[in-house]
A protein has these predicted regions:
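Short, glycine-/small-residue-enriched flexible loop/hinge segments at domain edges that mediate gating
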Residues: 80-95, 109-115
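Acidic/histidine-rich, surface-exposed loop or edge segments in extracytoplasmic proteins
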Residues: 51-59, 79-83, 140-144
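Charged, glycine-interspersed solvent-exposed loop segments at helix/strand-loop junctions
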Residues: 142, 146-205
Length: 205
């Protein structure tokens, strides 16, 4: 009788754990997947502008899955581009990861004159040299998936965490980023950005 009750207790605990896991990870992921499948656009349209005799390219707007194809087309059409200006509120993490891959592959420098926030920072960190204007801001927070902040969920935040670790972001800085709820923004000053080696140079804008 004792072992039967223990078995029942284990089943109940496992069921509760499954329900909690589904509600904290499964549902947000399902929502995000549905949004991708239906191609629901949540962010401002992405635009590009050529600068400095076609040696620089400005990316502004929201980042979506597929933005990487737009960037690649611009770089193929204008092979002298060496510097990518970023002015974005962020967007989908998968789109940002793919954009970062292209920036690395093409060995581009990155530059922020005004603000690069959220997923945009993943793209910025892919630059060989990472420049920022004297009034430029990099704004960080934990990722959001399916309308849910991942700041208190290690499983959901793993993708963003991996990107930052691969970019060489130090632990103290990363912990601050991942502890910032998705609805908030942490904007470190240039001294902190230098200390963390996020930026390589502050330039006149």
């Amino acid at each position: 009788m004792l072992w039967a009750n223990v078995a029942k207790a284990i089943i109940i605990i496992s069921t509760i754990g499954y329900i909690i896991n589904i509600s904290t990870t499964g549902i947000p992921v399902l929502k995000e997947s549905y949004s991708l499948i239906t191609q629901h656009q949540e962010y401002p349209e992405l635009h590009f502008r050529l600068l400095n005799n076609e040696t620089e390219l400005e990316l502004y707007g929201g980042i979506e899955v597929g933005s990487e194809k737009q960037l690649e087309a611009q770089l193929d059409a204008h092979p002298n581009i060496k510097l990518l200006h970023l002015h974005s509120i962020g967007g989908r993490m998968l789109g940002a990861i793919r954009l970062a891959g292209i920036v690395k592959q093409r060995k581009l420098d990155t530059y922020v004159k005004e603000r690069c926030a959220s997923a945009c920072t993943v793209v910025y960190l892919a630059g060989v040299n990472r420049l920022i204007g004297e009034n430029g801001e990099l704004a960080f927070h934990a990722a959001g998936i399916g309308g849910t902040s991942t700041h208190n969920n290690e499983a959901l935040s793993s993708s963003l965490k991996t990107q930052y670790i691969n970019a060489g972001v130090p632990k103290w800085f990363l912990e601050k980023v991942l502890a910032t709820p998705n609805e908030d923004l942490w904007i470190p000053d240039h001294n902190d950005l230098r200390k963390a080696k996020i930026i390589t140079q502050v330039v006149n804008s």
